[in-house]
Amino acid sequence: YGGDAVFLLAAVLDTKQLHDLAEEATSLGLESVVEVRTEDEIEALDMSAMDIISINNRNPDSFETDIYTSVRLKKFVPNDKIIVSECGIETGKDIDLLMSHGIHAFVVGEPLLRVEEPGRALAELLHSVEGVRSRR
């Protein structure tokens, strides 16, 4: 019945709120996942209490996705943070590209929701990721 992490949105919370909530999460034994969409949001963060930075690839104005958002924004995140890429990840090639740029984890949703057998689709997606196949 416990949680492992809290999900904090940089677009909604100010810098002090983000820092205070991340510190409180740490004091409770929780990880902090902070979602960012822009360079400005990243630069405003005090990342000392933040463990995981999740880069949202969806443009909030147009709702279009571009996985290169993660590639562009990763360079503004310290190397000691875990980086997650979310939205717009459709194929194993997308994951391979992101992995080649040092992205650690991925949120894949829409491609699994559009099919009748999401478990099978996930297995096929993972099988198509070169980085996953080479670890076996």
What are these regions (language model features)?
Residues 1-2, 37-49, 85-108, 120, ...:
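Catalytic cores of alpha/beta
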Residues 1-8, 74, 78, 83-85:
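Long, low-complexity, intrinsically disordered polar/charged segments
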Residues 1-17, 54-63, 101-122:
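Glycine-rich phosphate-binding active-site loops on the catalytic face of alpha/beta enzymes
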Residues 3-4, 28-30, 49-51, 79-81, ...:
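Short, well-ordered coil/turn segments that N-cap beta-strands
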Residues 24-26, 50-53, 71-72, 101-102, ...:
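Short, hinge-like loop/turn segments at secondary-structure boundaries
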Residues 32-36:
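Long, charge-dense, solvent-exposed interaction surfaces that engage phosphate-rich ligands
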Residues 73-76, 99, 112-136:
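C-terminal helical cap(s) of enzyme catalytic domains, especially alpha/beta-barrels
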